[in-house]
């Protein structure tokens, strides 16, 4: 009995450390997502079982990989400029921290946010079990309203687009200038058009047949589409606008917990809601949390954080002038409202990102539904025993313990990797590094999806270059997932993504 216990414990510890290693790789390599690792392990699971490796250990590898990934994926987003869909919103704040010489501080705030998101989401699992378990069973009622809920949330996300744009001259002429310059309605309209355009792109892409030229298992066009929309497009912008960086301050101290408790708790709540709703991501949850904070601030008579893309102000300054301003602020040690907002956005996004990972694992065992590629792999690997009694299942407790351990281990890893990345910045010219990442991501896309994926990557990149030039948030590109799901659910068709 004791021998069997220690045998299982050793497999679990080995899986934990190997998963932490894989999560570090997926977090740092742009375009290489934990879902790819999960699907590869799923394909290899019969062979691993024959070698004597238990499926519980394979599951622990997947879970620990996903947890560490959510901690470390801020680093390529901010220090290289190659985010995945979940960290799209952190690019601009993280990039501003980098330009101001405060990249280390951004990494520290991200680590604290992920840590709080991990711990604050744990009590929410119990709340979710009560609400969505067999006693109340809210999920059946929620499922009937799912497309309406997704539509309402999408409209709320679009409504938070506060950018003011000019209507085209012909529109102004037709309407007698009732629709004129500096119009918020024009910004909302532009965001809506881009959201729908990304959705149609996603609907077309996910219907395409695709095979890997080298036989990689479960090829998915989600990789090239998201890599184009949020990764390569950002990298090209950075390559064209930034040639050198200021010296970076070695400020790796974690921020105090108390000021971040409230925003990170609501981030965990938003992450929990995103965990049960298919197609919603950490980026959308972050926008909702920041929007909610703005509403609360206005109710209290305070000034909220703006989420505008100040296109007119930016076009008045050249890239060199913007860099000089950032360096000057770094040298003076002045922390303005923009810096405070950037740091809070980084912490909130990291908290949401990690909370979503914890909650999708919880919902897998509460309602038996997968909400990510990793949990889908777990569900396909072996039967999931749902949490129907007062006590959680042993399998769920084991994987939750692995999640906590992986999150604790990820904290010092972030500091070590962040320091190494900044040394790379000092040793390798930024533009050379960016071009190297673009070539690497393109090669990875070809290996996994062939020339079809390359075509999808090119189209996605073109779409991804549009938002900053129009003046809207790039996160509206998540219509690539939301719009197809809403189309399928409203039409009462089978969901080809496996979320419902």
Give residue spans per PLM region.
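Transmembrane alpha-helix interface/packing and boundary motifs in multi-pass membrane proteins
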Residues: 18-35, 68-81, 157-160, 268-278, ...
């Amino acid at each position: 009995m004791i021998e069997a216990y220690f045998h299982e414990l050793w497999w679990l510890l080995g899986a934990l450390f190997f998963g932490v290693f894989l999560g570090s790789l997926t977090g740092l390599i742009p375009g290489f997502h934990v879902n790819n690792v999960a699907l590869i392990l799923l394909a290899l699971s019969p062979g691993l079982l024959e070698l004597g490796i238990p499926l519980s250990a394979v599951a622990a590898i997947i879970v620990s990989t996903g947890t560490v990934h959510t901690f470390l994926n801020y680093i390529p987003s901010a220090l290289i400029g190659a985010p995945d869909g979940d960290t799209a919103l952190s690019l601009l704040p993280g990039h501003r921290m980098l330009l101001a010489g405060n990249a280390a501080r951004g990494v520290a705030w991200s680590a604290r946010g992920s840590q709080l998101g991990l711990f604050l989401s744990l009590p929410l699992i119990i709340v979710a079990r009560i609400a969505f378990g067999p006693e109340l069973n809210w999920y059946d009622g929620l499922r009937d309203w799912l497309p309406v809920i997704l539509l309402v949330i999408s409209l709320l996300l679009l409504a938070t687009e506060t950018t003011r744009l000019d209507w085209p001259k012909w529109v102004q002429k037709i309407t007698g200038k009732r629709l004129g310059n500096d119009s918020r309605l024009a910004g909302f309209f532009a965001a809506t058009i881009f959201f729908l355009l990304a959705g149609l792109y996603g609907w077309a892409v996910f219907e395409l047949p695709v095979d890997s030229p080298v036989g990689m298992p479960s090829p998915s066009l989600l990789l090239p589409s998201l890599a184009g929309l949020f990764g390569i497009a950002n990298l090209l912008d950075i390559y064209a606008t930034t040639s050198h960086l200021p010296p970076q301050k070695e400020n790796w101290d974690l921020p105090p917990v108390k000021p971040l408790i409230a925003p990170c708790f609501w981030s965990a709540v938003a992450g929990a809601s995103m965990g049960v709703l298919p197609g919603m991501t950490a980026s959308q949850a972050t926008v909702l949390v920041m929007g909610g904070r703005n509403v609360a601030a206005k109710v209290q008579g305070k000034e909220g954080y703006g989420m505008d893309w100040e296109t007119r102000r930016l076009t008045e300054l050249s890239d060199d002038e913007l860099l000089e301003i950032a360096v000057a602020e770094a040298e003076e040690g002045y922390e303005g409202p923009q810096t405070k907002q950037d740091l809070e956005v980084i912490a909130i996004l990291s908290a949401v990102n990690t909370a979503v990972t914890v909650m999708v694992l919880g919902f897998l065992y509460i309602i038996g539904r997968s909400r990510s590629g990793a949990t889908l792999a777990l569900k396909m690997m072996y039967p999931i025993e749902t949490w129907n009694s007062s006590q959680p299942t042993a399998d769920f407790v084991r994987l939750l313990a692995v999640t906590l351990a992986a999150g604790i281990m990820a904290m010092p890893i972030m500091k070590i990797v962040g320091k190494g990345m900044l040394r790379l910045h000092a040793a390798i010219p930024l533009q050379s590094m960016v071009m190297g990442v673009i070539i690497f991501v393109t090669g990875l896309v070809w290996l996994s999806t062939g020339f079809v994926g390359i075509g999808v990557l090119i189209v996605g990149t073109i779409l991804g270059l549009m938002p900053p030039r129009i003046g809207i948030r790039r996160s509206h590109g998540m219509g690539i997932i939301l719009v197809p799901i809403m189309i399928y659910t409203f039409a009462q068709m089978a969901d080809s993504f496996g979320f419902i």
